Amino acid sequence: LGVKRFCPTAQVTCVEKSPEAFAYLEKNARCALAGQGRQTENLLEPTAFEQADAPAFDWGPALNALKAKPAYAVQPVQGDLFTYWETLPEGQLDLIVSNPPYLTAAEMQQLQPEVAQEPAMALEAGEDGLVFYRALAQHYRQALRPGGALVLEIGWQQRQAVTDLLAENGWADIECRKDYGGNDRCIIARRPQIKL
């Protein structure tokens, strides 16, 4: 949803596996036409049109459209990262952003109490913490246009392993960005440009 905030004209699809989290994604993705009405929790409800401070404006058509079918700033999709790539046409996307689970099995055993309350499926990524990165590296490059970018959040010790996975799978211009604490936190990789 942050991508849509920074790029309001972009067509954005958000994919979520968990049915519980998907319900929240749908709620957060709903919006009114062109941001009209009052916004609450990133969600514009039909009542926002009825209470808007624009008495001279006829909210009727927009309100009726919203009540009939919610308008979405992004398209929410319930899907699984391990199979969703099969639904994507080749070379149509400009950007893929993913914050996949990245904790190893050993790290899962040492979680702080507040983190341990999170669902395991949101945290655990196999024995080495790389299972989701393997899928992204192997299957998602073809969905991007040449020069399109893949942006991944990583664990602070995963820079080299994720960089190697991406390089082995034909990604180009791989770089790492640090978080405000100075830890490796994000990797950006691109589908190679077509050479003429």
Where on the chain are the PLM-derived regions?
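Mobile active-site "lid"/loop adjacent to the S-adenosyl-L-methionine
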Residues: E45, Y102-V131
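Flexible, glycine-/basic-rich loop-and-beta segments that form/coincide
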Residues: P192-L196
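Short, solvent-exposed coil/turn segments
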Residues: V74, A116-E118, G182
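Glycine-rich, phosphate-binding/catalytic loops in enzymes
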Residues: C31, Q112-V115, E168-N169
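Residue-level signal for inorganic ion chemistry
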Residues: V3, L25, N99, V115, ...
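Conserved SAM/SAH cofactor-binding pocket of Class I
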Residues: L1-G37, E41-M108
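Structural detector for helix-capping/boundary residues
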Residues: G79, G91, E118-M121, N169
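Conserved Class I SAM-dependent methyltransferase catalytic core
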Residues: K17, E127-R190
